[in-house]
Structure formats: C-alpha cells, structure tokens
C-alpha cells in the first residue's frame, strides 16, 4: 500500500469508532494511491502526504456547502485540496480535506441498494481524486474521473458505480 498520513475527525454520532474508520479509510485510500501510482503514473511526495477526513452530519455539511460553494443543501462528500494541483502532477505534502455526511451516505446507499461501506468506499475514492486535481465539471473531465473511480473500485472488488447512468457532471 502507498503510505498516507490520514487524520480523522468524527463530528457526529453514528459513525464507527475512530480506530475502525482509520483502518477502513487507510485500506481504501491506500489502494487508490497504489493504483494511481502504479497504473496511472501519479507521482506522490517521498514523505507520506497528509489527508484529513471529517465524518459529520447533514446539517454540518450543508453549512459548509453553503459557505464554500453557495449551495444551501446537504451533499454526500466535499473535498478541499490544500494546494492547487493538476491531475497527474506532483501534489504537495498536505493533500487536503474530505468531508462526508453520514445521513446522506446512508440514504444514498439505501436508494442505490448498496451497502453503506461500499458507498462510503466510492465517496472516499471520489473525494481523494478531487484532492489530486480531478474534477467532473464537463463531460471530458467526468469521463476521466469516473473511469478512474471505476478502475480503483474494481481493484477493491466493487462494481462500476456509474453503470447504466449518464455522466454525473456538476455545474
């Protein structure tokens, strides 16, 4: 596994214990980093880069979404890169923050007929790619990012989350 310095903050009841989340996220993000390094030639710093993960609730993520994106609604995941980086280029020593809302993850997992862990895995990979400069603001970007997500998730034994769907671009 690629080395990452993962910091976790649990701001809401209902999430697993910190040790459990850290092991789960380490496995998911480590596998994503290895795939990107080995298959996509993504460079990483020699020292393990830091990723901050915040596990919160819908109310908190709605406030953050309103403040930083001008969207006054809850969302599943928000990512805030510490430094601007282009996809495939060397990131800084601090990758940034990924914030995930428990209620939205639970609701979406139920609607998608997936386990909570499988959906959380997808959202962690999605957020991690944002920290590395990937985006889905237009169809070309979405195709690249969603392709990476699908290949990383396949390495983790999960199916294509976009199968049968149009590209998920967000304005």
Curated annotation (Swiss-Prot):
Binds 1 zinc ion. Belongs to the endoribonuclease YbeY family. SUPFAM superfamilies: Metalloproteases ('zincins'), catalytic domain. GO terms for molecular function: metalloendopeptidase activity; RNA endonuclease activity; zinc ion binding. InterPro entries: MetalPrtase_cat_dom_sf_prd, YbeY, YbeY_CS. The keyword Metal-binding applies. Keywords: Cytoplasm, Endonuclease, Hydrolase, Metal-binding, Nuclease, Ribosome biogenesis, rRNA processing, Zinc. PROSITE patterns: UPF0054 (PS01306). It is an enzyme of class 3 (hydrolase). It is found in: Cytoplasm. Pfam families: YbeY (PF02130). Zn(2+) binds at residues 126, 130, 136. PANTHER family: ENDORIBONUCLEASE YBEY, CHLOROPLASTIC (PTHR46986:SF1). This is Endoribonuclease YbeY.
